[in-house]
Amino acid sequence: ELTELAGISRGTFYFHYADIYALMEQMESVQLARLESLMDNLIPNISREDVPPALTALFSYMNDNPEVCHAFYGKNWESDFTRNAKELIARRCLGQLQANGGGTQRQQYLLAFAVNGCFGSIVAWQDAGCQPPPEEMAAITWQAIRAVKVLL
């Protein structure tokens, strides 16, 4: 039972949350807000060659908190949370493209490729025991993002 694992009474849990789904919803909201903040740091730096510290921090967080990642992203990273995260990333990137006069169907397909590719790379990385280290994985991911950006 969750309350036993957390070391709290059922009364304390239900004082704060209606049920376990309310807890998950709140935790997902916090993670999506973190992702939104990450996008705030990544999008303005898309033309820079150096890996943004926020991307390295994301991989370090996933490396240090694998249980949290598996809880949110589910088996094979195909959960409601994952879909929401992908939509958030795509919406933010598409918004940037449209602000610069873009947003064509071709760009939308390239963006879908990039977003799904990033998530696929993360799955492969976690399946490989989070090797290479977070810093190197962030650099690989950044290189892939920038390669697609050239095509946009």
Regions found by a protein language model. Name each.
Residues 105-127, 132-147:
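Hydrophobic alpha-helical segments that form the core
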Residues 76-101, 105-116, 146, 150:
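Amphipathic alpha-helical packing segments from all-alpha helical-bundle domains
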Residues 38-42, 46, 69-72, 97, ...:
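Secondary-structure edge/capping motif, primarily at the C-terminal ends of alpha-helices
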Residues 27, 31, 35, 39, ...:
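Hydrophobic recognition helices of helix-based DNA-binding modules
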Residues 1:
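Short alpha-helical DNA-recognition segment
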Residues 4-7, 14-40, 44, 56-59:
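An amphipathic alpha-helix adjacent to DNA-recognition modules
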Residues 48-94:
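Helical hydrophobic small-molecule/effector-binding pocket
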Residues 29-41, 52-60, 83-90, 110-114, ...:
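A short, Lys/Arg-enriched amphipathic alpha-helix from helix-turn-helix/homeodomain DNA-binding modules
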